[in-house]
Amino acid sequence: MILIIAATLWQSLTAVAAVRELYVSPTGNDSNIGSVKEPLLTLKGAVARAVALQEDAAIDGFVVNLAAGTYTQYEALEIDTSLHKPIEFRGSNTAERSTISGAMQAERFTAVEDNLWRVRIPEVVRYGLRFEQIYINGERRFRAQSPNRGEFAGIKQVKHIPIDSTNLGRDIYGWEVLNITPNNPIPFGNECRTQYIGEDAPSSKNKEALGQPLITFFHKWDTTRRPLLHVDSCGVMTIAGRGVYPWNTIDTRSRFFAENDFNFLDAEGEWILSEDGWLYYIPCEGETIENTVCYIPIAQQFIKINGESIEKQVDSITFNNIDFVYASYLTPNEGNVQMQAAAGIGTVVEANFARNIHFADCTIAHTGLGGVWFKRGCSDCSVERCHIYDVGASSVKIGESTIRDNRAEITHHIKVDNNIIQHGGFVFPCAVGVIIFHASDNQVTHNDIADFRYTGVSVGWNWGYGYSPAKRNIIEYNHIHHLGWAQLSDMGGVYTLGMSEGTSVSNNVLHDIYSLYYGGWGLYTDEGSTGIRIENNLVYNCKSGGFHQHYGKDNIVRNNIFAGQIRTQLEASRVEEHLSFEFSNNIIYYSKGVMCGINWANVGHKSDYNCYFCTDSEKKIEFQGISFDEWQKKGQDINSVIADPQFADVAAGNFTPKNKAMLKKIGFKPFDYSKAGVYGSKAWRQKAELSKEQEEAFDKLVDDYEKEMITDW
């Protein structure tokens, strides 16, 4: 018995000795030792303490315990290979969270008028502080803009003037001036503004607002942001910058808004910063000076994890139960060039040459940049049970947009599971929920992805049939919805590119995707998409189609439900000599719009064992003018049927098919689409639900745009 007790005591002591506990508190000090009684103050201090202790052979790793409360952090925590033992940062389990905040709190507003407040930010003049986002009581507020938020200005005429004819490839000029004539003049405060472009730009010539007005253009799938150079008495705006892509230029079908001019300050929730440091704000309904707190983000990033090479990586870092909130983005002097999916825009958490980096039960919110990026040479990392919302760009990014010569540096085996990823792209509307660039063997599963202005999940980064490392990516059991908001075009709930053998897009629920012009698709296999299995998805209420393939080969579209798309149910574009895709065992159900469009009847595909049904008895099932009988005579859908699938309750969103004879005939295997989305506690699942007001706003927007029946492009 004595021996057993002694052995147990020894095991207990050695277990305690293996992991060193450090403690951090908002009332701590980084000169302390990091004990319970003498806690540290910052994460940086905890890392420094761990580095100092790690040579002790009795220590196998560290747990950094963060007391509840708010930790102000204006600079990113940088972790490199100087820390070579595992470390876990563990937040509080109490009702009060452990919060890393990158913001300072402004003083209390004072009233200028009944509906206009102001507060002085002395750091603007004293230290040259700049900011382009603010948060009121934890909610994002937008700089004064014209037209007001949710509205856009049209363009009457655009004149492109190359001033640097250096061809950057594919007819992209090095630099050009654009003269933009809007449909209606924008009410800028001064008739003429001048701003130099470049790193050595002089201070603003605008004597009211700090910084020049910015113009954000929406063109097809991109946005471009440029400072205003000049506006003449007729309202013609002059801007300059790198040439736009000729295949997605700024033209009369583009739209825009202008921001950062005192004349635009006219709507609830708008704000503007004067050059002498006064922040002016129009309060929203219910806000009083006494109950309003203004947060001004200072930090741009929270965490930077950087190994040295694929041979010398940072390893084994975990963040548990910590909130990261309030981070800034500052527009460069020259603005932002167009880039699909805001590809080059960073995140508040970034890792390079790192493995076994894990985020669990964390929050990332209120940012100017995106959320998390496992960028170069990362593997075996994860984001699980995290709430990532109200971000300026994309929420999760995996891999790089370039292919390195050393293929070992390709990021792989990243897991993104059971996260709520919502309300994104507020600074960069072309951003996406989750994007996988040149990266393989990743899992994006059981996430709720909603309220982005563009695509939900993007996979692959090669346009065509050239080499792509984006293989064997798993996009399954996600709930992807309420995307587009009629701001951009050419988007998908799930969007793929390039040779993607082994990739699965399955068991997802995708709905309510609405583009401005063309291309509001549920499932979208774009240029070169190859070897992708698409099955057991429920897709409904998308503008342009439940499925669209631009071009690709050897894709399998099987056992899906495509129900009630708005304009078209199915689309395909490029005719190629090979088999583009197989389309079988699917249910296509609709009441409005047409059955198929663009080039569906001509694209090389094999279609069979499908069920087609239109609830409008006056409409015939046709394939771009080809009757069902004629379609079968062409060798397509020989074993397919026209039959009512007898969904349980379409109005209530219950798409369970009850027509057993039809199911047997086409070989459809019912799947439980209720498993898509987040899982866990009832509270977690409820948190993923959009508010009734948001859903109603989306429905109203769709109704309004459908009344206009915009068909450009």
Where are the regions a protein language model picked out?
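Bacterial Sec-dependent N-terminal signal peptides
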Residues: 1-19
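Extracellular polysaccharide-degrading/modifying enzymes targeting complex plant/algal/animal polysaccharides
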Residues: 19, 23-358, 363, 404-405, ...
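Extracellular beta-strand solenoid repeats
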Residues: 65, 78, 88-90, 101, ...
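Predominantly extracellular beta-rich ligand-binding scaffolds that present long acidic/polar faces
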Residues: 74-88, 531-652
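Short glycine/acidic-rich loop motifs that flank beta-strands on beta-rich extracellular proteins
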Residues: 75-76, 300, 328-334, 368-374, ...
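Beta-propeller domains
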Residues: 243-250, 260, 287-312, 325-328, ...
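Right-handed parallel beta-helix
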Residues: 315-326, 355-366, 378-393, 406-425, ...
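N-terminal catalytic cores of secreted or lumenal carbohydrate-active enzymes
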Residues: 341-343, 353, 375-380, 399-400
